[in-house]
Amino acid sequence: MNNSINHKFHHISRAEYQELLAVSRGDAVADYIIDNVSILDLINGGEISGPIVIKGRYIAGVGAEYADAPALQRIDARGATAVPGFIDAHLHIESSMMTPVTFETATLPRGLTTVICDPHEIVNVMGEAGFAWFARCAEQARQNQYLQVSSCVPALEGCDVNGASFTLEQMLAWRDHPQVTGLAEMMDYPGVISGQNALLDKLDAFRHLTLDGHCPGLGGKELNAYITAGIENCHESYQLEEGRRKLQLGMSLMIREGSAARNLNALAPLINEFNSPQCMLCTDDRNPWEIAHEGHIDALIRRLIEQHNVPLHVAYRVASWSTARHFGLNHLGLLAPGKQADIVLLSDARKVTVQQVLVKGEPIDAQTLQAEESARLAQSAPPYGNTIARQPVSASDFALQFTPGKRYRVIDVIHNELITHSHSSVYSENGFDRDDVSFIAVLERYGQRLAPACGLLGGFGLNEGALAATVSHDSHNIVVIGRSAEEMALAVNQVIQDGGGLCVVRNGQVQSHLPLPIAGLMSTDTAQSLAEQIDALKAAARECGPLPDEPFIQMAFLSLPVIPALKLTSQGLFDGEKFAFTTLEVTE
């Protein structure tokens, strides 16, 4: 854990210090004073009464001794509780299908003042140009948008076709960027454990920063070895004892509650007064509909308090201070003198009802953010351009031949989890011996002209129709699920025509589709418009059967080979436990 003060992230000049000290001593006028407020004490528990004094971007003082201090402007908190701005410890903004600019507009008014982002989705499609765009967005954002340098592009060498590479030389060019906090999730954990030099070179290059992990279900000597390599955290834990063991071995635990992977209920019982500095909250992947209707990190805090009886100061601690300390962001995470004035005023701390947000010492106005969004997006120079180098397909591209009496592997979906099970089904002249089997195919979209990789999917709930998408972790090829080859082809051709996106087909017609013009991953629409379009897509998808809560997000992980057990990439069926390709037909 990176506990030392990291001056890389703490940009304050001597002149600013002198002004801040003068206000703190009571010798100068503050910019803002927040009156009629109680401050939640994240260290001791309880509350601190008294004003919060702000000069520039920083807090100059806290407490009753500043009751009569002068200020250019006073903010009446009307009895609100003040807490530090919320921090998401690990996410991929691209998975929201929003640009970083739109994401800020949607989440900053909810109290999310800081994000630790790994832009490996767009880097897999566009390479360094994608990372550079995210850095430009971070530089101009009001929200503190920090970047972890994507470490595994592609997620696993030799297992899939992606759009670009991201070499160590390119990674090093970004290491000292002021918004870079470390190395993003090291997904090739077998390679790290076995001591592959190319991976150890990456870890060594970023060892003075924070090294993110990714090791779902890992235990025993393998987990010890992974941690020995220097990995500091994991957001992939999904079992209580798994999380406990990682904490025991010195890992920090990121408790994830996204739109597909929902691990909070399983892991929340671990959080206590003792280990909460080692626990953080993250979303990883959360779509705009859920952000609009349920919230972001604010929704996770609410559930910790209401459903898991986590004490207030502990719930808000893991949502701010714990993460700030872990990433060396020592100017964030507490409402204390000298800290950055990222403040969330809550009219109800138990329900996480946000009344007002300040970031870097300035009040945030949601309407102003919305009004400026288009201009700020244009200023960031988004990397437009069609990234779909694939010709239209026909039903014959998805033809599979099955032999009666033979057994075939089936990717079995677990609703609201990223892991899958590897099962099998026997084929007869009447079809498979289970009625929930549908077809799945992955088509590379980067001009390699490979035939579709085809397989079988169980448990997804698709009774009719087809779903297709270019959001397909991490290489973001085209993934399609369907009950008929004709409808699969129709869905795929729609997303090709759109230049990337999502599509639902039923009754031989496109029922709903969402174009994603930036890298086939993101829309330029507003957050509200996106949420409405996602709502329409989900409604159309529900007509196809009892699908997962977030069918497109769940579908997006069926091609990710670094999460067990059975996945399908553009290269074929992949055993995520043996880390090797396997065959559709069971022969052993």
UniProtKB/Swiss-Prot annotation:
Q: List the disulfide bonds.
A: none
Q: What is its EC number?
A: 3.5.4.2
What reaction does this enzyme carry out catalytically? adenine + H2O + H(+) = hypoxanthine + NH4(+)
User: What is one Pfam family matched by this protein?
Assistant: Amidohydro_1
**Keyword NAD belongs to the record:** no
Q: Name one GO molecular function term.
A: adenine deaminase activity
User: Does Ligase show up as a keyword for this record?
Assistant: no
User: Which cofactors does the annotated protein need, by name?
Assistant: Mn(2+)
UniProt KW keywords: Hydrolase, Manganese
Reading the lineage from the top rank, the first entry is: Bacteria
- GO biological process assignments: adenine catabolic process
Family per similarity comment: Belongs to the metallo-dependent hydrolases superfamily. Adenine deaminase family.
Q: How does it assemble?
A: Homodimer.
Q: What is this protein called?
A: Adenine deaminase
Origin species, per record, is Escherichia coli (strain 55989 / EAEC)
